Amino acid sequence: MESSRSLEHVLSMQGGEDDASYVKNCYGPAARLALSKPMLTTAINSIKLTEGCSSHLKIADLGCAIGDNTFSTVETVVEVLGKKLAVIDGGTEPEMEFEVFFSDLSSNDFNALFRSLDEKVNGSSRKYFAAGVPGSFYKRLFPKGELHVVVTMSALQWLSQVPEKVMEKGSKSWNKGGVWIEGAEKEVVEAYAEQADKDLVEFLKCRKEEIVVGGVLFMLMGGRPSGSVNQIGDPDSSLKHPFTTLMDQAWQDLVDEGLIEEEKRDGFNIPVYFRTTEEIAAAIDRCGGFKIEKTENLIIADHMNGKQEELMKDPDSYGRDRANYAQAGLKPIVQAYLGPDLTHKLFKRYAVRAAADKEILNNCFYHMIAVSAVRV
């Protein structure tokens, strides 16, 4: 994976509807959305709307991916805004119309997204007008002062690129032997942190131009506890996270079996960084134009917590489930790097490793950070 190569054409959640698709494995994001919904509702209620304001409100979901989670988010926003407008209009049905922009990289499965939307509204009245906007949210996507509400859910942990320093063979920042940064050398983590900071500031600068004064920006992203030097908060979760132990072992299996060279393995890095609340606040402060209304740390339980005893009776099914979950988020970029055949072999080995995982009885938790901000 060349660091200079844009990820825009390959980075996406796995499309389609098979067992490894994002649609079939989005229970993790669904849990995150459920936990953040009260805060999202409060954030949307804080928007300043007055009688006689614009005839329609514009909402953007950035990094929308595909599936029911996408629609759940925007439906929450539209529902809350509708109730707020009804109060302003004295309890009558508001005449306000809503326009929703679903935006993600061009590699996203927009066909599946809008096919699902058509099925969802078939036979019922559509609550909003919908449009797709392909492109990176690290760049401008909309005209100046165009949007009233912007949400981005479980997307900002993905970086615009793998840091170039990490790809410099022999340098202190070279991530030799690993495909992510959990447990990596300090210099590797620092390179990722630098890239993550640059990306977040660019994201905020773009949204500052696009959101109207008084508009709302709501961000939910993978995070880590304040003061933690590790990307994953606790040892048990670190061992079971889909990006860590099993992934490294599966790549090493390909090397040990002579299917790829070590250099090939060392050239792949997952472009993800989990920020702290302090890192996020610093970027917002440096960018300007936004006032943070609330920040909240959320701890999400893995969907398999509490089911370990049952799963031990069928370890092969457990292994396939874990491999499918990993593929839902990683298969497109792995396949762009390795090709279909080696990608299939990699995740087969991932499934075998997961089935034999002695950490199966341990619980796993994910840290998320929710931030609501107002454009000032």
From Swiss-Prot:
Q: How does activity depend on pH?
A: Optimum pH is 7.5.
Record carries keyword Magnesium: yes
* Catalyzed reaction equations: gibberellin A9 + S-adenosyl-L-methionine = O-methyl gibberellin A9 + S-adenosyl-L-homocysteine
Which stretches are annotated as coiled coil? Answer: none
Q: Which UniProt keywords apply?
A: Magnesium, Metal-binding, Methyltransferase, S-adenosyl-L-methionine, Transferase
Q: Where, by residue number, does the polypeptide cross the bilayer?
A: none
Q: Name one Pfam family in it.
A: Methyltransf_7
Binding positions (gibberellin A9): 158
Which terms under GO biological process does the entry name? methylation
**Any idea of its EC number?**
2.1.1.275
Could you tell me which InterPro entries the record lists for this protein?
MeTrfase_7 (IPR005299), MeTrfase_capping (IPR042086), SAM-dependent_MTases_sf (IPR029063)
Upon gene disruption, the observed phenotype is: No visible phenotype, even in gamt1 and gamt2 double mutants.
Q: Which residues are Mg(2+)-binding?
A: 175, 179, 265-266, 268-269
**Which positions are annotated as binding S-adenosyl-L-homocysteine?**
22, 64, 69, 104-105, 136-137
Chain's role: Methylates the carboxyl group of several gibberellins (GAs). Substrate preference is GA9 > GA20 > GA3 > GA4 > GA34 > GA51 > GA1 > GA19 > GA12. No activity with diterpenes abietic acid and ent-kaurenoic acid.
Family statement:
Belongs to the methyltransferase superfamily. Type-7 methyltransferase family. SABATH subfamily.
Which protein is depicted? Gibberellic acid methyltransferase 1
Native source organism of the sequence: Arabidopsis thaliana (Mouse-ear cress)
